[in-house]
């Protein structure tokens, strides 16, 4: 907003906020898709900067190092500065550790909610992993848990299969818009 009335200024509460706000998006990201990119962008709308924690492990030839290399390209397209870290144990642990060690900042943690899997089965998503932030509000008063809506129902196994079938189509259908140079870089990462 460029201009607002005095009443609006006091009602929105922004004038009272003095703590820095950090958005955290933890996950596996094998690979990071357009949906992940859009989720981080959405979280950054309410923060000054972001942190992505990437889980270890490998799925169909895509490991954490490849995932980080792709996020390092994505962060150039995000609206706010974003750090990308490989989690030595798990993104969940790193998120809780960061919250415990950084009580002087406000933290927004993004986690996927319930969604449909194959057939008629559903998953609870990742929200359950971060319930302690809600249950222990006295311990984590500076943390807000934000459910990430599945704007695009893109599943990792579908993306990995599409990459194997036709990587050029996969880049168009499952990855964010970016320069041809960056698309080529991601293609090289995924086919290495």
Model-derived features with residue positions:
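Nucleotidyltransferase catalytic core that binds NTPs
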Residues: 4-192
């Amino acid at each position: 907003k460029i201009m607002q009335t005095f009443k609006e200024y006091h009602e929105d509460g922004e004038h009272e906020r003095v703590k820095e706000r950090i958005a955290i998006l933890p996950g596996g990201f094998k690979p990071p898709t357009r949906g992940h990119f859009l989720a981080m962008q959405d979280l950054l709308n309410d923060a000054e900067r972001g942190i992505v924690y990437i889980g270890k492990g490998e799925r169909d030839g895509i490991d954490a190092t490849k995932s980080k290399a792709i996020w390092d390209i994505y962060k150039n397209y995000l609206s706010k500065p974003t750090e990308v870290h490989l989690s030595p144990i798990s993104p969940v642990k790193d998120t809780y550790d960061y919250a415990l060690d950084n009580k002087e900042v406000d933290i927004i943690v993004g986690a996927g909610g319930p969604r449909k899997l194959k057939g008629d089965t559903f998953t609870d998503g990742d929200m359950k992993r971060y319930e302690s932030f809600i249950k222990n509000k006295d311990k984590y008063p500076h943390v807000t848990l934000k459910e990430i809506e599945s704007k695009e129902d893109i599943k990792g196994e579908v993306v990995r299969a599409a990459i194997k079938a036709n990587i050029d189509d996969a880049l168009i259908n499952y990855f964010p818009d970016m320069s041809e140079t960056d698309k080529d870089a991601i293609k090289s990462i995924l086919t290495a």
